[in-house]
Every structure is written in C-alpha cells, then in structure tokens.
Amino acid sequence: MQDNSVNETKNIVEVGIDSSIEESYLAYSMSVIIGRALPDARDGLKPVHRRILYAMHELGLTSKVAYKKSARIVGDVIGKYHPHGDNAVYDALVRMAQDFSMRLELVDGQGNFGSIDGDNAAAMRYTEARMTKASEEILRDIDKDTIDFVPNYDDTLKEPDILPSRLPNLLVNGANGIAVGMATSIPPHRMDEIIDALVHVLENPNAGLDEILEFVKGPDFPTGGIIYGKAGIIEAYKTGRGRVKVRAKVHVEKTKNKEIIVLDEMPFQTNKAKLVEQISDLAREKQIEGISEVRDESDREGIRVVIELKRDAMSEIVLNHLYKLTTMETTFSIILLAIYNKEPKIFTLLELLHLFLNHRKTIIIRRTIFELEKAKARAHILEGYLIALDNIDEIVRLIKTSQSPEAAKNALMERFTLSEIQSKAILEMRLQRLTGLERDKIKEEYQNLLELIDDLNGILKSEDRLNGVVKTELLEVKEQFSSPRRTEIQESYENIDIEDLIANEPMVVSMSYKGYVKRVDLKAYEKQNRGGKGKLSGSTYEDDFIENFFVANTHDILLFITNKGQLYHLKVYKIPEASRIAMGKAIVNLISLAPDEKIMATLSTKDFSDERSLAFFTKNGVVKRTNLSEFESNRSCGIRAIVLDEGDELVSAKVVDKNAKHLLIASHLGIFIKFPLEEVREIGRTTRGVIGIKLNENDFVVGAVVISDDGNKLLSVSENGLGKQTLAEAYRGQSRGGKGVIGMKLTQKTGNLVGVISVDDENLDLMILTASAKMIRVSIKDIRETGRNASGVKLINTADKVMYVNSCPKEEEPENLETSSAQNLFE
C-alpha cells in the first residue's frame, strides 16, 4: 500500500493507519483539553460553564427576576452553543448551584439540586434556576466590547471566547477535571484572602510567595474541615503541585457514663451517607472497637453525625482509627493546571494572580475605550445642539425654506460647518428641547461629558489610574462577597512546634553599629560593683562598635523599628546564640533591610493586644502613638510604622500600656519635657504624628520614657559615664510641644546626655555599653537619687564614651564570687 496515493476513479486518498490514528488522537486530545475538561486561567470557567452563564445572561435571568425552568436553559445551551448531551450540561448547571460544591455559587437553584449525601438532583423539567449576584459580576460589562466573540459550532451565532469576570473565580471556586493525559485539581479559596493578595501584587508587582502567604492562608473548602500541615500548601503554591491532609471537624460530648463523638464538618468532596455507612460497617465488623451506634442527625441547620461510644471506650483512640480507616481524613491533591493562550499549563499561585490582574486590566482598558467613544459620539451631537440653540431663528428659517430634508441637512452642514450626524440630530430634535430648561440640561450634559472624557483619557494614559480602577473594583467585590473562613488550617499533627523544644529563658540581644546581631544567655554577664571596669560584650570590626542591646525571653516577638520608620518582626530564638566575645550575624541575613536602613529601636512583646500601643519618637521632636494590634501583620519587607518628615529619623519607640499617664522626652543637651499621654491620641500606622518638644538649635532627641506614676524613677546617664536617679514628679508637667526644663546638669565633666530610662523596680541592674564594646552591669539601688538639676555619680571608670544604656533583670549573687582582676575582665 502506497501512502498518499490517489485513486482518480474513486477519488479516495489512501493513508497509513498509524499516521491517521496519531493525527486523529491528537486532534481529539486537544479538543478535550481545550474545549471540554480544563478551565481558562482568566475567568476560571470550562466552556460548558461559560456557555451556561452566557445563555442565562441572554435569557435575562438575573438574580432579581423570576426563576426559569432548568430545561429551558439547558435547551438554549445545547441548541445555540454546546452540542453535547443534555445530562452533561444539566450536571454542570446543578454543580454551580450546590453550596457544598462551590465556595461561591454561580447559579441560584430552586428545587432539588442534590445533596452532600450523593443524592441526584431532580429532573431538569422540575427544577428552576437563575443567576446569582456572583455570576452577574462574572458577566458584567460584557456588552461594552470588553471581550472577543467567536462563531458558535454551526457559525450562526456568536459566543464569548472569555468572560470579563470581575471576581477571581478560578481561585475562589476552584476547578477539577480530567483531560487526556492530564488533570486539574484547583482548590477553592476564601474571597477576602485572594482579593487582599491581588491588591498586594497590584501595588507590589515584584512581591514574592512569602508575602502572598501572609494573605492567602490556604484552601478554604465550602464544607469546612481542618487542613493539617502547611508544607503541602506552600509546595503547591510554589510549584503548582502539592498535597494536603483534610480532616473532618469533630467535637466530643460527655454524658454521665460515656462519650459521644459528633462530626460537624466534612472533608471536601466526601459523601456523607457513604461515610456513615462506612463507619457502621467497620464497627459491625469489629475493625474499630468501642462504637455502639452511628446515626445521622443532620438537618437544615448543618451537619451532625453522632458516633456513640461504649462505656469503656476512649474517644482519642476511636478517632485515630476513624481517621486512619475512613474518609474522615482525605488527601486533597492540588494541581494548578489551566488553559492560557489555548495551551494547558501548570501555574504557580503568583502566576495565577498576575494573569487575573492582567485580564482585568485588559477588560478595563477595552471598557474605557468603549465608553470613551460613546461619550465622544454623544458630545459631538450635543455640540451640534448647542450650535443650533445659539442660532435657532436662522436654523428654523433655513429649514422652512429647504425643499426637502436632504436639502435642509446639506444646508445646515454648509452654513454652520456641522457633520452629517449633527445635522441629522438637529433635524430630528423635538421642539420642546428649545425651552430654556431643556437648553440648560443640554449644557449640563455636555459639560459632564467633557469631564467624563477627560477622566476616561486619564485612565488610558496613566498606569497608576488604571491600577487604581482595578484596585477599587477588587475591593468592591471583596466587600460584596466577603465571608468568614470555613476551613481551619493547623500545623501538622506529626510535627512538634519548634517553640516547645526551646527553653523560654532571658537573653541579652546586642546589635553593633554595622548591624551585627547576636543573643547571649543573661547569666553570662556577672554583676559588678559601681565603678567597675566591665566585661567585653562582643568583638567587633575595628571601625564597628556595639550600639544597642536589650533583654528579652527566647519566645518573645521582637519588633525592629528602623530610622526610616519601618517595623519588622522576629522571634528571639531565631537570632543565633553566641558567646560574649563573638561578633554575631549580620541583621540583613535575618530581616530584609534596605541599604540605607538602620535599626533604631527594638521592642519585645508576647502578643499584639489592642490594650497597648506603641509610641514613636523622632530626632526632631515628633511623637506618635499607634495601637499595637495594627502591627500584627508581618511582611518580609516590613510594614510602615510612622511617616517621617524630610531630614528626620526615628530615635526611639516604647510600648504604652493602660497604666501609662505621661510621656517624657529627653534631648542631647539635657532638656526634658513631660506631658500627658492623652495629648497624643492613637492614630493609624501610615501617619506622621505631632510635635512633642520644641528643640533649641543643635539639639536633638536622644531618648524617651513612658511614665505611669509620678513616683516612677528615671535614670539619666551622660556620655562620660555619670548617672543619677530622679523622681518623675521632679519634672513639672507641661503641654505637648513646649521647650521643656533642665533634666540633668551637664558640664564638660559629664558630657552630653546619652539616654534616660525608667527604673521603677529596684530589683533591676543597669547595663552600660561603651564605644569600645565594653559592658558593665551595676545594681540600680547603688545609684543614689538626686534632684533634676544634679549631675549624678560616676558609674563606669573608663575613658570610653558611653553609647547606650538599658536595664535588665537582677541576677542572683553567685556563691563565693571573687572580685575579678583587671587582667581577667576581658577573658
């Protein structure tokens, strides 16, 4: 047999069967992949779903009109757009109406549309349907030339190639389907989280997956349940493939003599009736011991499957068997496979977010062009009306003297330089529009159109304006379809929380001028008497020195606030532990600082209670207060804590609790100002603040204290190592923004002020850092109390300049402690 030989008498082309099968199978495969089984990455719909929604749109079945028989909808879909079996189309319609299948239903069904027990829907002649508000948003603006239309199967009608889709349907509702040689399994998600992620990507196009995971916690199934472990979620979002364990949500009820396990939520796509039957069979066959009865008490209020246990049965053991042997625990495979540019592709989460944003930008640009052309056309006609109204007498006379409408039209065009469209509009104008009121309406409409045209042109010319429209519409969708998370996400039950393995102990965390950070056990620093030489707290580079330190427990959350007003989170135990003399690790390896960014304040907290706030103090005397709860979110790039004036920078930040009454600001030249806390009200993160102190020339803020009682004591330290304790009441209160009073008497002997701290608890030690990296620990009670205008006593005998001071918990006196010699102080 010769390939491709033509029998001219019979007009038959002979081909090899192998090549024919190969070509036919490839054509069939692509038809199934592109035209049937996989969703589009932009609107998240398979062709059958898209055709159903478009057919309902053409029938006018909005969410506000009466329901129409499902058979009518299916008939329109089959006859006009989808020449396949009616059962396949009806099944697709039914699924879009099931609240246990869709996170956001696209069809509002009336009648029996099936159940989570696997019951089939009633026949299409009995059920009725219409669109939901969500599907209306998917089709919104379709009549404004926003998408391309293609011929239907018999080339008699047009159907949409894609839908505008204002909402991210692919990620919100997910998708599943089996094609030829490939399959997709995209889980549903919570609308609020996806919208927040889209807005973040819109504002930060280079955002990484770590930032997106702050918004998208994971899948959110319509049936609830619990996802265990985040590793599979992260892997799926990173590569497009992953697996997650999903468990039913249960609770245990106790009666007088036994326990009852109640199943409240199901794993996604689990048949409840089959699960109940499966549990009953396992109990009857003694594969699971301890179950006396299983019954389904579910109703319209929700799912309730009751598993009664025998008297001696332990619920924890029974539950472990149920998870192992039944579909109370399932594995959901995530495959982010979708169609884009007529080709199937596995996407990452970030790619899907970018694709949807690009789709929305394209839709908005096309809609804007459509509205712009429409507005221009209307404005063109109104310009003709205004010309006619300004010359009404002449126009009436010209029309009266014309022999025909055509002649009148030509005369108007020639006399007033009008277009043909304008001339026709004038000739068709009603006489009532010649009244003064109608004239004003025309002028007002024309003016509004000019403003609209200018606005639409602005959207087309400005990327920022376009992004603003996308963001506004996304937030509108979020507000309209916001709902609580249904699926709980927990750490894997196979993993142990790392914090459980780390002792919660006090640590000294130090940071050098060049940004090297470390933590050292507090016990490594022995207490010395006042006037001691100190111990070396860490080695540094020749031109580096330790400039900041603080004491916190290993489980605490550290808040790093930079000179640029950015705030970063970090657990204390994530800072590498080192010896006293070690240099530490560069902070840029732990948090993502900008090249010109420097840590200026570090605070520790155990939680983000809204009963506390953060007070920020800048070098130029600005103070600001923001509720601590606003800083709970954490981003790799940090979050904005304060907006700074040009040339200003942050110098200090403090935690303010409910007992705080005053704030005190101290300057380099020893000037203090104390004012009521209520004079600094709480404001948002992205704001500037108010003036706290008016500074003299060459002066700047070096520290601040939160005061809860006038009996509080303040400890001031100068750069030459002198210090004193003073009662807070010694500083008279003023109004915020004043010039302040002398807080410490400064001389050439004392040097300028380095800092001021609160020392209400005498069971504290003072730790002092010098420029050469020496640290001395002194008991607070050894520093005598003096008036505000005193210079204080010598705290450290060294020629070094004091750089920073802070307090730390008192250490127990070691037994048989000997005084160290000068030679051993640096060992």
From Swiss-Prot:
A motif (GyrA-box) lies at residues 528-534. CDD domains: TOP4c (cd00187). The active site is at Y126 (o-(5'-phospho-dna)-tyrosine intermediate). It catalyses: ATP-dependent breakage, passage and rejoining of double-stranded DNA. InterPro entries: GyrA (IPR005743), GyrA/parC_rep (IPR006691), Gyrase/topoIV_suA_C (IPR035516), Topo_IIA-like_dom_sf (IPR013760), Topo_IIA_A/C_ab (IPR013758), Topo_IIA_A_a_sf (IPR013757), Topo_IIA_dom_A (IPR002205), Type_II_DNA_Topoisomerases (IPR050220). Gene3D superfamilies: 3.30.1360.40, DNA gyrase/topoisomerase IV, subunit A, C-terminal, Topoisomerase II, domain 5, Topoisomerase, domain 3. GO terms for biological process: DNA topological change; DNA-templated DNA replication. Keywords: ATP-binding, Cytoplasm, DNA-binding, Isomerase, Nucleotide-binding, Topoisomerase. Pfam families: DNA_gyraseA_C, DNA_topoisoIV. It is found in: Cytoplasm. Residues 38-501 form the Topo IIA-type catalytic domain. GO terms for cellular component: chromosome; cytoplasm; DNA topoisomerase type II (double strand cut, ATP-hydrolyzing) complex. Its EC number is 5.6.2.2. GO terms for molecular function: ATP binding; DNA binding; DNA negative supercoiling activity. The keyword DNA-binding applies. A type II topoisomerase that negatively supercoils closed circular double-stranded (ds) DNA in an ATP-dependent manner to modulate DNA topology and maintain chromosomes in an underwound state. Negative supercoiling favors strand separation, and DNA replication, transcription, recombination and repair, all of which involve strand separation. Also able to catalyze the interconversion of other topological isomers of dsDNA rings, including catenanes and knotted rings. Type II topoisomerases break and join 2 DNA strands simultaneously in an ATP-dependent manner. Belongs to the type II topoisomerase GyrA/ParC subunit family. HAMAP family: GyrA. Few gyrases are as efficient as E.coli at forming negative supercoils. Not all organisms have 2 type II topoisomerases; in organisms with a single type II topoisomerase this enzyme also has to decatenate newly replicated chromosomes. Heterotetramer, composed of two GyrA and two GyrB chains. In the heterotetramer, GyrA contains the active site tyrosine that forms a transient covalent intermediate with DNA, while GyrB binds cofactors and catalyzes ATP hydrolysis. This is DNA gyrase subunit A. The lineage of its organism: Bacteria, Pseudomonadati, Campylobacterota, Epsilonproteobacteria, Campylobacterales.
